[in-house]
Amino acid sequence: MITRERLVEEFALLDEKATLLASWGVIPEEITLYLIGGGNLALRGIKDATADVDVVVENVRVLGFLDEVLTNPSPELKVGPGVRVIYVKKVEHKYKVKLGAVSVYRKLDPEMRDFNMDVFVKRVLRGLILSEGMKNRSVLPSEFEDFKTLRVRLVSLEDIFLFKGVTSLGRAKDIDDLLRLLEHGVDFEVMLGELNNQGMIIGPERFEWLVGLLYEKLLILRKVLAEKGLRSRALDKFIKELGLSFV
């Protein structure tokens, strides 16, 4: 599992490597990544650790630059305590391909255990699209403010809620994360606004299917809360508004 401390350390090493590559003119002076999923929650301290790190980039061109940072094996690219940071691109990874990841990388580290990174281009899990609203709501955490080349931004908790809300109903860990987000506090009005936006940029059939997934997952979430003797009026209102507006 990847802890918050490991996340910060690994991205710091990647920024050093990216800065060296930028100084050679191999990549641009700035690359923006959007951290979603469990890595985002771990960095915020909302969960202890995550199995892998999910990142979204804006286009294939940025993916190419990030690929260079992750996989370039040059011995001159030593960072931190004189080490080389090299990831292996996992092309044949059926589970991740099924989810729609464009590229899956793994850093083999016998001392600190593996570090897995899934990189999506614009669209996540063949579902929601990284919109201008999502980018505008994202924040640059203090841990990454001093980076020179990588701009690792955290998408909002509301957008994480939506990303996790439209995954397969069988992903139990997403229900756990949705409970954490609900406990931490999210703005359902922001989510309704983003859903309206997604409805305009995603094809109607696909959008209807995604909203159906979200609706079913929210019903499961409400049932889990009820089994714990809990209730969220805000969640109830969101489910009702979702049903009236989209389902």
Regions found by a protein language model. Name each.
Residues 1-247:
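Compositionally biased terminal segments of proteins
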